[in-house]
């Protein structure tokens, strides 16, 4: 399992990014308006304070979920765990979440994770590189899906144990 730790960590970021995007894009403000942070109960405000400390703001989905402090706390706990530095850095995870959001056409997620990448020092060149790689892989995936291709790289592309970009410098 240790050899796959990076993949599990990345998969967690992908899943949690999707979950947050579903709330944000599926419950827009005209359907279920976000609360003002000051209108939330004490339990929800404590969570929202932690969200603000992490993001520098409180993204709308967290304010929407403030109506249900338990749900808010559960989702925030999952987001926080997924995006903390572990084997992969938060900066790399924000780039991955940006790519996931861009590919799934989540306006909320694309804006949130682009803003976080910028906060964490990713410049215009880095943003364009991530966008280009995302576009390329998304295009190839659509072509492969359309042609119903099966993966055939198992015997010629062995597992690479080296750390992913943003991972620990000395290897795992």
What is each model feature region?
Residues 1-172:
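Hydrophobic alpha-helical segments
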């Amino acid at each position: 399992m240790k050899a796959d730790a990076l993949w599990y960590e990345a998969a967690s970021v992908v899943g949690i990014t999707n979950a947050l995007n579903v709330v944000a894009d599926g419950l827009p403000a005209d359907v279920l308006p976000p609360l003002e942070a000051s209108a939330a109960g004490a339990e929800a405000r404590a969570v929202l304070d932690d969200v603000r400390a992490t993001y520098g703001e409180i993204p709308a989905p967290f304010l929407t979920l403030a109506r249900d402090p338990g749900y808010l706390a559960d989702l925030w706990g999952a987001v926080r765990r997924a995006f903390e530095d572990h084997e992969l850095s938060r900066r790399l995870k924000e780039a991955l979440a940006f790519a996931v959001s861009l590919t799934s056409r989540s306006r909320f997620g694309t804006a949130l994770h682009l803003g976080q990448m910028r906060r964490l020092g990713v410049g215009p060149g880095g943003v364009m590189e991530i966008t280009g790689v995302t576009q390329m892989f998304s295009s190839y995936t659509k072509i492969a899906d359309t042609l119903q291709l099966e993966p055939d790289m198992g015997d010629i592309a062995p597992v690479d144990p080296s750390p992913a970009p943003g991972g620990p410098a000395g290897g795992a």
